[in-house]
Amino acid sequence: MFSREENELLTRVGPGTAMGNLMRRYWIPALLSEEIPLPDCPPVRVRLLSEDLIAFRDSNGRVGLLDEHCSHRGTSLFYGRNEECGLRCIYHGWKYDVEGHVLDTPAEPADSDFKKKLRHTAYPCREVAGIVFTYMGPREKMPLFPAYEWVNLPDNRMHVVKAYLECNYLQGIEGDFDSSHTTFLHCSNLADLARLNRDGAPTLEAEASDYGMRAISIRQLGPDKSYVRISPFIMPAFSIVPGPATAKFEENDSRAFRFWIPIDDTSTWFYILTMRDTPFSAQERASARSWVDSRYFRIRNAGNNYLQDREHQKTRSYSGINAVIPAEQDGCATESMGPIYDRTQEHLGYSDKTIIALRRVLLQAAKSVQEGREPPHLVTDPKLNDFSRLRAVKGVLPANGSWRELPDLEEGMV
């Protein structure tokens, strides 16, 4: 049973918490590049790990992520003037650069060196794949940015979207490692009862790795073959899932790198970075965003009961939620648990094997930071910074075959 103390440890992410301190040791998404599209464009509010921040793009195109409140007397920098390579507070004109240096204090005497004694809270940023990443931990411990597959992928072979979730991040990411739910929640054809009977209870395995963990699910396709999916969990709250298999389990080369980023304890930004080996069309890109509005709120949400169609539920789909992508159905399942689910009330079975393993990995990592030890997957050696082969893997094997025999199981998965 998951204890109340363990639940608190994994779900609280503010400054000074065990999980919050852990997440701050990694490069994590802060916002999409498109939210601050041009030099000197209006700044935007960013709430991240229970901290209120302001993101802006300066005159040279550099991105800054600052504490929202001016170091002078606390006025919000959201209303500031973004000009001449800095963000200037509208109250007394204090001006900050992207690194938090105080460039100007015009209300102070001309000969004052007051500004040289100050440093506003600012977090380093890096833009990759249409996402602004930030590092919020100790500067002296800042790791290298991990060189995942998408770091050097052409823009036309990937697209990214984010969505707002009204629940704790852990509820969301646990769904990525709950293989058995896909048979039911995402079933779009009730007539396919054979499929429900065939793969409702997959064989599950979990294996620790230097980057976190990988989850393995094995479904029997008959007496002589099985379908295998291997999904990595990557510290601190990332996952990779393969593209959906067709009804005939044909190949689909798409894969999605997913980030579950806490806004605070009870809300989450969910980023989906989708990749494949051929370019995406403009129509495909538009469709991939059609389930969120201009603020990245989901069209189907708790306020409209996820637009569930009860008649459709009776006759067609298992959930009655006619989603553009499965994540919309996942949102209903995870948000309806409440803001932070009390895991002391759950009753876990075999189908939760990989979720239990995921929690164990996170607990060990959080406790490592509590005890002053380094958590896993902090990249510090440039020679070891190559994760381009780290992917989700899927394939069909003989019934008695091992998942380790999959041809795409590269060194990066180890």
Which positions does each model-derived feature cover?
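C-terminal catalytic domain of Rieske-type non-heme iron oxygenases
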Residues: 15, 37-38, 62, 133, ...
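Rieske [2Fe-2S] iron-sulfur-binding domain
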Residues: 16, 32-159, 201-203, 340, ...
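A boundary/linker detector
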Residues: 1-24
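Generic N-terminal leader segments that precede the first folded domain
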Residues: 28-30
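Short beta-strand or tight-loop elements
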Residues: 26, 49-51, 121, 211, ...
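A short, structural micro-pattern
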Residues: 24, 119, 126-128, 254, ...
